[in-house]
UniProtKB/Swiss-Prot annotation:
Disruption phenotype: RNAi-mediated knockdown in larvae results in defective heme accumulation in the intestine under low heme conditions. Double RNAi-mediated knockdown with hrg-4 or mrp-5 in larvae results in defective heme sensing. This is Aspartic protease 10. It comes from Caenorhabditis elegans. Gene3D superfamilies: Acid Proteases. Residues 72-425 form the Peptidase A1 domain. The gene is hrg-7. The lineage of its organism: Eukaryota, Metazoa, Ecdysozoa, Nematoda, Chromadorea. InterPro entries: Aspartic_peptidase_A1, Pepsin-like_dom, PEPTIDASE_A1, Peptidase_aspartic_dom_sf.
Length: 428
C-alpha cells in the first residue's frame, strides 16, 4: 500500500489552481473472477446474496450502488496531520466516507483475502507492503473476518482540526450496507494544496461483507449535493464554494488499458480543463437534473441496428460502473450487432477479442459520438473478451442508461459544477 500511496500521489501542477493527478485502476470483480475461471461460481454466490437482501433494498431510500463493479480510485487525506485513504471515485453518489477507527474494533490492519492470489507488483499497489512476498503462490495472507480489518481507518483523536457532527448514516449497496456517523475535518487530495476546510464526511463503523474483498478504503462521491445522504456538500463542490478552483470544473480521463491493475489508469483534473489527454473542443450538454450527471440520450446505433425513441432516454455519466448499463432490449440488439454471445451461466456477454466490429454510436444533444471496439471489447484474462454492456433495470428516480468507463475511454468528461452541464471532449 505504501508504494501505491507514493505513486498515486504524484502531482502535476498545471497552474495556480488547476491540478492533475493519476487515477488508479483495478479490474472489477467480474473481470477478476472471469480471469480465474470462477465467474459462474461468483455470479451464483452473488445472486444468492442479492436475493437475501431484496426486501431490504426494496425498502431503502438510499442510492443503491454495486460496490463490486467499481474499478477507478484516487487518494485523498483527512485531518491535521493528514491521514491518507484510497477511495473509489463515484459520480453516481455524492457522499465521502472512510472507515472509522472503531470499525473492526480498532484493531491493527491485517492483510485482506484479496491479496492471496495477487501478483507481487500488483500486491504492492493495493496491499500493505508487509502483505507482499515474492513467492510462487504470490503473497502471504493473514485471515480476517471483519471487512474493516484490512482498511485504513480514520482516527479523530489524532486530528487537531476534527469537529463532531452528531448525525448518523446508513447507506445501502447491492452487496452490503455501510453504517456510521458524520464528522467534520479538512479534506485534501493527498500531497497537494487542493484542500477544503469543514468537509463533512462519513465515518463508517460497519461495512458489508463484500467490502472485505476490496483493497480500497471507501468512496468519494462526485455527484450533486441533492443526491447526498443528509444533503451533505460533496468535496468537489466544497472546493468550488471555498474559491479553491480556478474554474468550477473537474475532468475525468480514463485510459484504454488491459486486464491488469495499473497506477496510471487515467487522470483526474480539478479547477480547469485537461489539455494533456483531451481535445480543447468541448461539446457542452445540458443536464436534465442536478442529482446524477444526467442528460438526454437521443439514440444509439451500431451496424444495421438503430434505436431512437421519440422522447429519448435519460442517461447518466457513471465512473462507478465498469461497464455500460442499458435497457435489456438495447443490450441484446447491440450484442447481436457486434457478434457478442450471452452466456447465462455467467450473466455476461462474450466475444472474440480480435473481432472487427462496427463502432457503437450515441446521439447526444443532436451530435453523434462514436465509441470504438477498443472501448467496449474488454479483456479479462485468457479466452474470449467481455462485451462491456449489462442489462440495467431502471425506474422512477434512476436513469435508463449508465454510461460508464467504456464511453469515458473515448470521451473525456468535463463536469461543470456551476452551470449544470457536462462537457464531452474527444480523447487525444
Amino acid at each position: 500500500m505504501k508504494t501505491f500511496i507514493a505513486l498515486l500521489a504524484l502531482l502535476t501542477v498545471v497552474s495556480a489552481e488547476v491540478h492533475q493527478f493519476n487515477i488508479g485502476y483495478r479490474p472489477n470483480m467480474r473481470q477478476r473472477m472471469n480471469a480465474k475461471g470462477k465467474l459462474a461460481e461468483y455470479e451464483k454466490e452473488r445472486n444468492e446474496l442479492l436475493s437475501k437482501k431484496s426486501l431490504q433494498l426494496a425498502s431503502s431510500s438510499s442510492p443503491v450502488i454495486d460496490y463490486e463493479d467499481m474499478a477507478y480510485m484516487v487518494q485523498i487525506s483527512l485531518g491535521s496531520p493528514a491521514q491518507n485513504f484510497v477511495l473509489f471515485i463515484d459520480s453516481g453518489s455524492s457522499n465521502l466516507w472512510v472507515p472509522d477507527i472503531t470499525c473492526a474494533g480498532g484493531k491493527d490492519a491485517t492483510c485482506g483475502s484479496y491479496c492471496k492470489s495477487t501478483p507481487y507488483d500488483a500486491c504492492l499497489t493495493f496491499c500493505q507492503e508487509e502483505c507482499c512476498t515474492k513467492t510462487v503462490e504470490g503473497v502471504k495472507v493473514l485471515s480476517t473476518t471483519d471487512a474493516c480489518q484490512s482498511k485504513h481507518r480514520f482516527n479523530s483523536s489524532l486530528s487537531s482540526s476534527y469537529v463532531t457532527n452528531g448525525q448518523k448514516f446508513d447507506m445501502t449497496y447491492n452487496t452490503g450496507e455501510v453504517k456510521g456517523f458524520f464528522g467534520v475535518d479538512t479534506f485534501c487530495f493527498t500531497n497537494t494544496s487542493v484542500c477544503a476546510t469543514g468537509q463533512v464526511f462519513g465515518q463508517a463503523t460497519t461495512i458489508g461483507e463484500a467490502f472485505a474483498k476490496q483493497p480500497e478504503d471507501g468512496i468519494i462521491g462526485l455527484g450533486w449535493p441533492a443526491l447526498a445522504v443528509n444533503q451533505q456538500t460533496p468535496p468537489l463542490f466544497n472546493l468550488m464554494n471555498q474559491g479553491k478552483l480556478d474554474q468550477p470544473y473537474f475532468v475525468v480521463y480514463l485510459a484504454n488499458i488491459g486486464p491488469t491493475s495499473q497506477i496510471n489508469g487515467g487522470a483526474f483534473t480539478v479547477g480547469g480543463l485537461d489539455t494533456t489527454h483531451c481535445s480543447s473542443n468541448v461539446d457542452w450538454v445540458p443536464l436534465s437534473t442536478q442529482t446524477f450527471w444526467q442528460f438526454k440520450l437521443g439514440g444509439v446505433s451500431s451496424g444495421s441496428y438503430s434505436q431512437a425513441p421519440n422522447s429519448g432516454w435519460q442517461a447518466a455519466a457513471d465512473t462507478a460502473a465498469s461497464f455500460i448499463g442499458a435497457p435489456k432490449s438495447v443490450v441484446t440488439s447491440l450484442a447481436k450487432a457486434v457478434g457478442a454471445t450471452y452466456v447465462p451461466l455467467t450473466g455476461a456477454f462474450f466475444m472474440d477479442c480480435d473481432a472487427v466490429v462496427p463502432d457503437i454510436v450515441f446521439t447526444i444533444n443532436g451530435k453523434t459520438y462514436n465509441m470504438p471496439s477498443t472501448s467496449f471489447v474488454v479483456s479479462a484474462g485468457p479466452g474470449p473478451c467481455m462485451f462491456a454492456f449489462y442489462e440495467l433495470t431502471a425506474g422512477g428516480f434512476y436513469p435508463a442508461w449508465m454510461l460508464g468507463p467504456p464511453f469515458m475511454r473515448a470521451y473525456c468528461h468535463v463536469h461543470d459544477m456551476k452551470s449544470g452541464r457536462l462537457g464531452l471532449a474527444k480523447v487525444l
